[in-house]
């Protein structure tokens, strides 16, 4: 019997293997999780493809493109392989907190079409938090248009 995939994490990647590994490491390894990495034509002078992050991990699928068309293109490629009920789109330089699955599992059987999670922006060199203007704008928009938008949850 095939295990149902609840979450597909689709990660575009280009030339930051150390950050991609951190991202992968922050995603719990569970049978209901699929991790899809789409490398968008990384430079072989920067990336060692024989030791590519996630390549030998059971729940990780790695796809390579030669086009170099950007993160959106890579995400669309990943969508063609996604099997989950829910799609998550971290960037390669993102990483999750340890309570990620506690939050996600609250919504796994919900009827929402979209759940938007705010994120913290951190300056990596100093580990200093900074304002996340985009999250503030999205939250404001969603709260101001509740009558027009159905089945969206802002967490």
Language model: regions and residue ranges:
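Flexible acidic/His/Gly-enriched loops in nucleotide-sugar-dependent glycosyltransferase catalytic domains
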Residues: 56-58, 73, 102-155
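Short aromatic/hydrophobic "clamp" motif used to bind/position activated sugar donors
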Residues: 87
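Acidic donor-binding segment of Leloir-type glycosyltransferases
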Residues: 24-64
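A conserved hydrophobic helix/loop-capping motif in glycosyltransferases and polysaccharide synthases
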Residues: 7-19, 23, 30, 38
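Acidic donor-binding/catalytic loop of UDP-sugar-dependent glycosyltransferases
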Residues: 45, 94-106
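Conserved short acidic donor-positioning loop in nucleotide-sugar-dependent glycosyltransferases
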Residues: 15, 27, 40-42, 69, ...
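Glycine-rich, basic loop-to-helix element that forms the pyrophosphate-binding segment
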Residues: 66-82
């Amino acid at each position: 019997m095939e295990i149902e995939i609840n979450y597909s994490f689709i990660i575009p990647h280009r030339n930051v293997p150390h950050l991609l590994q951190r991202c992968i490491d922050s995603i719990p390894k569970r049978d209901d999780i699929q991790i899809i990495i789409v490398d968008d034509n990384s430079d072989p002078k920067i990336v060692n493809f024989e030791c590519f992050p996630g390549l030998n991990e059971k729940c990780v699928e790695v796809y390579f493109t030669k086009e170099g068309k950007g993160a959106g293109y890579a995400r669309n490629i990943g969508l063609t392989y996604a099997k989950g009920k829910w799609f998550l789109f971290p960037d390669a330089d993102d990483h999750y907190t340890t309570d990620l699955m506690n939050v996600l599992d609250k919504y796994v059987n919900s009827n929402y079409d979209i759940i938007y999670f705010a994120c913290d922006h951190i300056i990596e060199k100093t580990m200093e938090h900074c304002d996340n203007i985009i999250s503030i704008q999205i939250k404001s928009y969603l709260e101001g248009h509740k009558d027009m938008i159905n089945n969206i949850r802002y967490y």
